[in-house]
Design a protein with these regions (language model features):
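Patatin-like phospholipase
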Residues: 1-50, 84, 89-97, 141, ...
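Short, hinge-like loop/turn segments at secondary-structure boundaries
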Residues: 7-9, 155-158, 214-217
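C-terminal domain-closing interface element
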Residues: 40-63, 177-182, 186, 198
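Structural motif corresponding to alpha-helix initiation and N-cap regions
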Residues: 55, 122-123, 184, 214
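Active-site gating loop/helix substructures
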Residues: 62-140, 145-156
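Acidic, Ser/Thr-rich peripheral helices and adjacent loops at domain boundaries
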Residues: 152-173
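Short, glycine/charged-rich beta-strand-loop motifs at protein surfaces that mediate ligand recognition
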Residues: 169-179, 210-211
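C-terminal helical/tail subdomains of lipid-metabolizing enzymes
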Residues: 183-242
């Protein structure tokens, strides 16, 4: 969901509303999880915040002219679906589905299909972007160079317990490390050929997926800004923008 702010040209918006609301149990909390089935609250986080409390600029998003896609995992097939977002407010359920983490989120229904987090089936959609015709790719990673995911000894048992009706989903979610590591290998290969520019942190980030410490968010944000100030000339060279 953060990515839409690039196209709406609203820098610091994601940082601002996360710092403002991360301590609010209506935003994300175990209270929300127990009462609604979603750790990240559907109504407050995905509707009230962007529509009323920190308004997302849909007009600027549309005027950007840049195609924007989200990746979701079809829970019936275990396959990724790539959904083009033309109107953020009208397609909020697709955005929500793309980040619906297993166990702490309900399955999201969108246009007759049932979805969960797209990162389970295609964490790094390199092949999809190449198939769209892009010959130069920029990938933003959250892990340092050399990182590889390790298999989890317990994840398959847990997924089988909670998603026993969806064996294809259980299989792809349990083997996420395999798909992720293959994508990283492809990224590194494309870097060597000059077809891909990877932006990655210099070290492991001390922040969790459901992080609620505003100081950690601020520190990582500032670190990212400083890194890109140092890297911008290299990125422009890669793009041929001299």
């Amino acid at each position: 969901l953060f990515g839409v702010n690039y196209l709406s040209n609203q820098p610091q918006r994601a940082l601002r509303y996360n710092k403002r609301f991360m301590g609010d149990r209506r935003y994300m909390s175990f209270w929300s999880w127990l009462t609604t089935g979603n750790f990240v609250n559907k109504e407050f986080s995905y509707y009230k915040v962007p529509m009323e409390l920190d308004v997302f600029d849909q007009e600027a998003f549309a005027d950007s002219g840049v195609p924007f896609y989200v990746v979701t995992t079809d829970i019936e097939t275990g396959k990724p679906d790539y959904i083009k977002i033309d109107h953020v407010f009208e397609q909020m359920e697709a955005l929500r589905a793309s980040s619906a983490l297993p166990l702490v989120s309900e399955i999201v229904e969108y246009k007759g299909k049932r979805y969960m987090d797209g990162g389970l089936s295609d964490s790094l959609p390199i092949d999809f972007m190449e198939n769209l015709g892009f010959d130069k790719l920029i990938v933003v990673l959250t892990r340092p160079k050399g990182y590889r995911k390790e298999p989890s000894k317990t994840s398959k048992r847990i997924y089988k317990l909670f998603y026993c009706k969806y064996p294809e989903f259980v299989d792809v979610a349990s083997n996420r490390h395999i798909h992720y590591n293959k994508s990283i290998e492809k990224i590194e290969a494309l870097e060597k050929t000059g077809n891909l520019y990877a932006i990655r942190p210099a070290h492991a980030l001390e922040v969790g997926r459901l992080e609620k410490d505003p100081e950690k968010f601020e520190a990582i944000y500032q670190e990212g800004l400083e890194q890109m100030r140092n890297e911008m000339s290299h990125l422009k060279t890669f793009l041929g923008d001299n």
